[in-house]
Amino acid sequence: MSMRVGILTSGGDSPGLNAAIRGFGKAAVSTYGMELIGFRDGMRGLAENRFMQLDSHALSGILTTGGTILGTSRDKVHKMLVDGKVQNMIPVIKKNYEKNKLDALVCLGGGGTAKNAKRLSDAGMNVITLPKTIDNDLVGTDQTFGFATALEIATDAVDRLHSTAHSHHRIILTEIMGHRAGWLALGAGIAGGADVILLPEVPYNVESIAAAISRRSAHGSNFSVVAVAEGARNERDAAELAAADALVREADSPVARDAAKTHRANVEASHRAHTFTLATELEKATGLESRVTILGYVQRGGTPCGRDRVLATVLGTAGADLVAKGVFGVMVAAKGDGAEPVPLEEVAGKIRRVPVDHPWIRAAKEVGTGFGD
């Protein structure tokens, strides 16, 4: 009897999602004769049992398209808002899994999806994940699909900002996505020739940044471009966040943990305008006009680049191979040119940050890029 498999996309949208759906789906249907259904709008669609058939026709023509044909959401399976109340929907999801006679569930997503998938796996469902996020911050995989496209978009933005910064003798700060990891800002900063790159992993000192910019001015370069990761913080704010993180780790009960998480969210919210604050501080310190550009969601949109299409296809087809072999409870990780399974417990709840001695950081420093430290 052929296997019946469900697939969904969860968390933020990302270039390459449709390519991964296609890669898994075509291999599952054509190579292994599986029946494939796609749940709409992520975990919420799974809880509400909303799905569509994914046959060869539905999987055609989506390789190059952005977004996700299935829709997505950021719902947590154990804390989902339903009818005005936060409810644990894992029992409902398991009933739908059994009602649809699924042999496996494939979840495409990032860190939050890995945690959701681990909960479903622990509840007795056969689950695998494919690593999707422009942040490139998942543990256990060399790269996530979506990152390469976002890197191209962010690099193009940094390129373009050079000419306007030069023309008006300004400091231009461009805020780049990445959540609490600096991979995207670091890559775009290097590729775009940013003069300063600010990362979550390297708390910055405003005086150090101002001094680097002033040195450029003294040598005739009366402009600077600063690539700012959205999670970058000055030394004081970074210490405040670290203390809030410690409270979450040390919480000894669910109630204490929820309270600590709320405190951490409030601390993070108080830093929301950090790039604008930094621009004001640099303008005062250097005498140069400062402007801020927030790249925002443009980094997640549009058609995936060739590299992401290849990676999504490799991971998708490898996922179909694993399902056919009965390998579950894993993320399909990119390793070299191929893929291999990594247990979900090694991925869920963890963040792959940029090591401060990473070759990219060393290379950037050797070409004169500052990091504000």
Swiss-Prot record:
<feature type="binding site">
    <location>
        <position position="170"/>
    </location>
    <ligand>
        <name>substrate</name>
    </ligand>
</feature>
<feature type="binding site">
    <location>
        <begin position="110"/>
        <end position="113"/>
    </location>
    <ligand>
        <name>ATP</name>
    </ligand>
</feature>
<keyword id="KW-0963">Cytoplasm</keyword>
<feature type="binding site" description="in other chain">
    <location>
        <begin position="177"/>
        <end position="179"/>
    </location>
    <ligand>
        <name>substrate</name>
    </ligand>
</feature>
<feature type="binding site" description="in other chain">
    <location>
        <position position="230"/>
    </location>
    <ligand>
        <name>substrate</name>
    </ligand>
</feature>
<keyword id="KW-0418">Kinase</keyword>
<dbReference type="GO" id="GO:0046872">
    <property type="term" value="F:metal ion binding"/>
</dbReference>
<dbReference type="GO" id="GO:0006002">
    <property type="term" value="P:fructose 6-phosphate metabolic process"/>
</dbReference>
<keyword id="KW-0460">Magnesium</keyword>
<dbReference type="InterPro" id="IPR022953">
    <property type="entry name" value="ATP_PFK"/>
</dbReference>
<feature type="binding site">
    <location>
        <position position="12"/>
    </location>
    <ligand>
        <name>ATP</name>
    </ligand>
</feature>
<keyword id="KW-0324">Glycolysis</keyword>
<dbReference type="GO" id="GO:0047334">
    <property type="term" value="F:diphosphate-fructose-6-phosphate 1-phosphotransferase activity"/>
</dbReference>
<comment type="function">
    <text>Catalyzes the phosphorylation of D-fructose 6-phosphate to fructose 1,6-bisphosphate by ATP, the first committing step of glycolysis.</text>
</comment>
<comment type="similarity">
    <text>Belongs to the phosphofructokinase type A (PFKA) family. Mixed-substrate PFK group III subfamily.</text>
</comment>
<keyword id="KW-0808">Transferase</keyword>
<dbReference type="GO" id="GO:0005945">
    <property type="term" value="C:6-phosphofructokinase complex"/>
</dbReference>
<feature type="active site" description="Proton acceptor">
    <location>
        <position position="135"/>
    </location>
</feature>
<feature type="binding site">
    <location>
        <position position="291"/>
    </location>
    <ligand>
        <name>substrate</name>
    </ligand>
</feature>
<dbReference type="GO" id="GO:0048029">
    <property type="term" value="F:monosaccharide binding"/>
</dbReference>
<dbReference type="GO" id="GO:0030388">
    <property type="term" value="P:fructose 1,6-bisphosphate metabolic process"/>
</dbReference>
<dbReference type="GO" id="GO:0061621">
    <property type="term" value="P:canonical glycolysis"/>
</dbReference>
<dbReference type="GO" id="GO:0016208">
    <property type="term" value="F:AMP binding"/>
</dbReference>
<dbReference type="InterPro" id="IPR035966">
    <property type="entry name" value="PKF_sf"/>
</dbReference>
<dbReference type="Pfam" id="PF00365">
    <property type="entry name" value="PFK"/>
</dbReference>
<feature type="binding site" description="in other chain">
    <location>
        <begin position="133"/>
        <end position="135"/>
    </location>
    <ligand>
        <name>substrate</name>
    </ligand>
</feature>
<keyword id="KW-0547">Nucleotide-binding</keyword>
<dbReference type="InterPro" id="IPR012003">
    <property type="entry name" value="ATP_PFK_prok-type"/>
</dbReference>
<comment type="subunit">
    <text>Homodimer or homotetramer.</text>
</comment>
<protein>
    <recommendedName>
        <fullName>ATP-dependent 6-phosphofructokinase</fullName>
        <ecNumber>2.7.1.11</ecNumber>
    </recommendedName>
</protein>
<comment type="pathway">
    <text>Carbohydrate degradation; glycolysis; D-glyceraldehyde 3-phosphate and glycerone phosphate from D-glucose: step 3/4.</text>
</comment>
<feature type="binding site" description="in other chain">
    <location>
        <begin position="297"/>
        <end position="300"/>
    </location>
    <ligand>
        <name>substrate</name>
    </ligand>
</feature>
<keyword id="KW-0479">Metal-binding</keyword>
<dbReference type="InterPro" id="IPR012829">
    <property type="entry name" value="Phosphofructokinase_III"/>
</dbReference>
<dbReference type="GO" id="GO:0003872">
    <property type="term" value="F:6-phosphofructokinase activity"/>
</dbReference>
<dbReference type="InterPro" id="IPR000023">
    <property type="entry name" value="Phosphofructokinase_dom"/>
</dbReference>
<feature type="binding site">
    <location>
        <begin position="74"/>
        <end position="75"/>
    </location>
    <ligand>
        <name>ATP</name>
    </ligand>
</feature>
<dbReference type="GO" id="GO:0042802">
    <property type="term" value="F:identical protein binding"/>
</dbReference>
<keyword id="KW-0067">ATP-binding</keyword>
<feature type="site" description="Important for substrate specificity; cannot use PPi as phosphoryl donor">
    <location>
        <position position="112"/>
    </location>
</feature>
<dbReference type="GO" id="GO:0005524">
    <property type="term" value="F:ATP binding"/>
</dbReference>
<dbReference type="GO" id="GO:0070095">
    <property type="term" value="F:fructose-6-phosphate binding"/>
</dbReference>
